[in-house]
Amino acid sequence: MASKILFIGGTGYIGKFIVEASAKAGHPTFVLVRESTLSNPAKSVVIYNFKNLGVNFLIGDLFDHESLVKAIKQVDVVISTVGHAQLVEQDRIIAAIKEAGNVKRFFPSEFGNDVDRVNAVEPAKSAFATKANVRRAIEAEGIPYTYVSSNFFSGYFLLSFNQPGATAPPRDKVVILGDGNPKAVFNKEDDIATYTIKAVDDPRTLNKILYIKPPANTISFNDLVSLWEKKIGKTLERIYVPEEQLLKNIQEASVPVNVVLSIGHSVFVKGDHTNFEIEPSFGVEASELYPDVKYTTVDEYLKQFV
């Protein structure tokens, strides 16, 4: 029997992909929503899609303990996809899971770098630390978990090539942080969702980090630019920003540019997606666990922009 799954933050950016994957995989799927979300015009398309997929809405709020406990008691698994501002509030979910006493597994809001293995500067450093603190709280309470480290969303990073404010890949020049040699990992949101849902009832992912690092999506920035150049039949001007200059730029920038740049520093300069080995004691890799999943490669993903 497929586990019943409750989503908290299910109408958000990555949440909506995972909710859809859950429903399509045959899991009884529940989304915690506020009354106001159901009538919010900005969310109407997402809500409509969820209804068509047979998703159940449970009225409640992250800040209403009783509603959280009540919702959690109806399911087996809780997946949090809350946004940046609510990361720190996941203690509320942990407390409710603890009180409900029936949860087989909790997936906190992660879906990025492995926050226990990062070399970051502010403001990324604090964001990563918040997620790491949530991990420690889950472990301290003895709640069964899976942490999904899905690295970069293709829909953001391959669309923009990490150029702040860009809405399409570059056509003439491209700014590269550091020397462009460390490898990063780019995954399509639908694939992240598919792998996450496959992990829900898999004993191999219990109390582990699920890394989504498919070989064809692990590529250096220099190679990414070369791949793109081949596709558009044009050589781009490459502007390299040395680490020292980048650190200065981060300090001088304001939100959200400083966030984008500091995450870029962690990934593209320090190599935080790929500078460690996945040990069986703490992690497993999704494309190895689920070779049947036909994931979208970076090469395939870029074709749509040519």
Swiss-Prot record:
Q: What is its EC number?
A: 1.23.1.-
Give the enzyme class: oxidoreductase
Q: Name one GO molecular function term.
A: oxidoreductase activity, acting on NAD(P)H, oxygen as acceptor
Query: Which GO biological process entries does UniProt record here?
Result: lignan biosynthetic process
Superkingdom in the source lineage: Eukaryota
Q: Which InterPro entries match?
A: NAD(P)-bd_dom_sf, NmrA-like, NmrA-type/Isoflavone_red_sf, PCBER-like
**Residue positions binding NADP(+):** G9, G10, T11, G12, Y13, I14, G15, R34, K43, R135
- Keywords of this protein's UniProt record, alphabetized? NADP, Oxidoreductase
Reaction(s) catalyzed by this protein? (-)-dehydrodiconiferyl alcohol + NADPH + H(+) = (S)-isodihydrodehydrodiconiferyl alcohol + NADP(+); (+)-dehydrodiconiferyl alcohol + NADPH + H(+) = (R)-isodihydrodehydrodiconiferyl alcohol + NADP(+); (2R,3S)-dihydrodehydrodiconiferyl alcohol + NADPH + H(+) = (S)-tetrahydrodehydrodiconiferyl alcohol + NADP(+); (2S,3R)-dihydrodehydrodiconiferyl alcohol + NADPH + H(+) = (R)-tetrahydrodehydrodiconiferyl alcohol + NADP(+)
* Sequence similarity: Belongs to the NmrA-type oxidoreductase family. Isoflavone reductase subfamily.
Q: Any idea what job this protein has?
A: Oxidoreductase involved in lignan biosynthesis. Catalyzes the NADPH-dependent reduction of phenylcoumaran benzylic ethers. Converts dehydrodiconiferyl alcohol (DDC) to isodihydrodehydrodiconiferyl alcohol (IDDDC), and dihydrodehydrodiconiferyl alcohol (DDDC) to tetrahydrodehydrodiconiferyl alcohol (TDDC).
Protein name listed in UniProt: Phenylcoumaran benzylic ether reductase POP1
Species whose genome carries this gene: Populus trichocarpa (Western balsam poplar)
Q: What is the lineage of its organism?
A: Eukaryota, Viridiplantae, Streptophyta, Embryophyta, Tracheophyta
